[in-house]
Amino acid sequence: MISKEILIQYSDLQEEVKEVRERIERTERQIAKIEEDGNVIDTVSGGGGGIQHFKIEGFPYPEYSRKKTLLYARKATLASLELELMEMLNQVEEFIASVDDSRMRRILTMRFIDNMSFEQIGKVIGYDRTSISKKIDKFFEE
C-alpha cells in the first residue's frame, strides 16, 4: 500500500523534473549566446620584454564543449526522471482509485497529482483550506 511519504515523494519528483527542465533551458540559452557571439577577442602581452601586445581571436571551444556536455548530461537526467515519474504516477493513480470515498479520491487527486494547494482544493470542493488539510491527515491516520 502506498503511504503518505510516497505521495509526497511523487510531488517532490514533479518539482525536480521542473527544476531540471529549467536548468536545461538555461544551458541552451548559454550555448545559443556563445554561438551568437561567435569569436572572442583578447589581448596578451609578450615579446620584447612584455611591452608588445597581441590581439588573439577565436571561438571559445573549451567553454562551448563544457556547456554541450552539461546539456547532454542534463537531458539524460531528465529522461530518467520522467520515466521514474511516469512509473510513480501509475502507482499513485492506482492507490487513489482504490480509495472508497469519492470526495477523498478527488481531494487526493487534486493534492498529489494536480499539485493544488489546500486553498485551491477548498474552493473546488467547498471547504476551507484547514478542513482539507485535516481530511488528508485523518485519511492517513486510518
Segments from the language model and where they lie:
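Short coil/turn residues that cap or connect secondary-structure elements
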Residues: 96-100, 131
